[in-house]
Structure formats: structure tokens, C-alpha cells
């Protein structure tokens, strides 16, 4: 029996896959548990339509992410903070502060998407990764200088 998977099923396939299984397995387990639907012409056409819509939506998200990436990479976040003689900061620069600087520049990013393993605690220039939708990774330049 041919079925269309509605959920990821270990050993069978991913969502949207058209697979052949034994009729009893489909009727007694997969279909009642809403893991699959029978692969008739109506369901196949509906699946193809949904795939086209998802591809279109994914393309829009990709284009929007590319625009945001270009905006992020133009920005340099500059921080002037008090520092000791050895170049260590009194305090630190966190993802929340980087998000605030990006927002000042007109780029809205969720602070959880800023890939900063630990806060910046020393003077210097850093490149910080920002994870965007559609798997796009942008880098923002962060410059930390001493406050006179």
C-alpha cells in the first residue's frame, strides 16, 4: 500500500515522503496515529501543492535573511568601556548589548541568535556570528576600546 508520511517515522522516511508499506501496518498503525495518509490522487496533488507553497515561503525567508545579512555586515558595533592597564574590561560586552547596538543601526535581531560563547572581557576587535533564518550566518564586527 502506498502512503504519504505526515510525520517523520524512523525506518520509513521524512514528512512528505511517498512510501510503500504493508496494508496492515498502514491501516492499523500509521493512518490511525495520523503518521500517514493513503496515497490517492487527491492527497498526492494536495501534497505537491503544499510543497510548492513551502518552497515559495522558504524562498521569501531566504531573500529576507540575505537582506538582513547585508545590513548586519555593514555595521560595526563600537563600545568604549573602562579598562585596566592590562587591557581587561571592568565589566563585559554581552549579546544583549550587541543587540542594542544593532537595533540603534536599524537592524532587529533576537539576542539569542547572536553566537557569543562568553561575554567579551578584553579590548580589541572581534567578529561575532549571528544566526539568521534559512541557515544563513552573518558576522558583525565588534570593536571594544578603552574609555579615556
Curated annotation (Swiss-Prot):
SUPFAM superfamilies: L9 N-domain-like (SSF55658), Ribosomal protein L9 C-domain (SSF55653). Keywords: Ribonucleoprotein, Ribosomal protein, RNA-binding, rRNA-binding. The keyword Ribonucleoprotein applies. Signal peptide: none annotated. GO terms for biological process: translation. GO terms for molecular function: rRNA binding; structural constituent of ribosome. GO terms for cellular component: ribonucleoprotein complex; ribosome. Belongs to the bacterial ribosomal protein bL9 family. This is Large ribosomal subunit protein bL9.
Amino acid at each position: 500500500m502506498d502512503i504519504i508520511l505526515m510525520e517523520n517515522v524512523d525506518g520509513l522516511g521524512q514528512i512528505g515522503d511517498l512510501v510503500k508499506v504493508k496494508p496492515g501496518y498502514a491501516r492499523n498503525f500509521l493512518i490511525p496515529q495520523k503518521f500517514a495518509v493513503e496515497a490517492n490522487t487527491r492527497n498526492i496533488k494536495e501534497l505537491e501543492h503544499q510543497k510548492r507553497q513551502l518552497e515559495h515561503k522558504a524562498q521569501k525567508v531566504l531573500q529576507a535573511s540575505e537582506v538582513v545579512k547585508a545590513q548586519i555586515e555593514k555595521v560595526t558595533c563600537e563600545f568604549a568601556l573602562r579598562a585596566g592597564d592590562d587591557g581587561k574590561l571592568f565589566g563585559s560586552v554581552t549579546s544583549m548589548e550587541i543587540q542594542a547596538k544593532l537595533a540603534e543601526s536599524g537592524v532587529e535581531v533576537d539576542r539569542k541568535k547572536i553566537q557569543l560563547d562568553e561575554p567579551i572581557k578584553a579590548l580589541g576587535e572581534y567578529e561575532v556570528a549571528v544566526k539568521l533564518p534559512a541557515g544563513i550566518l552573518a558576522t558583525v564586527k565588534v570593536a571594544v576600546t578603552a574609555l579615556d
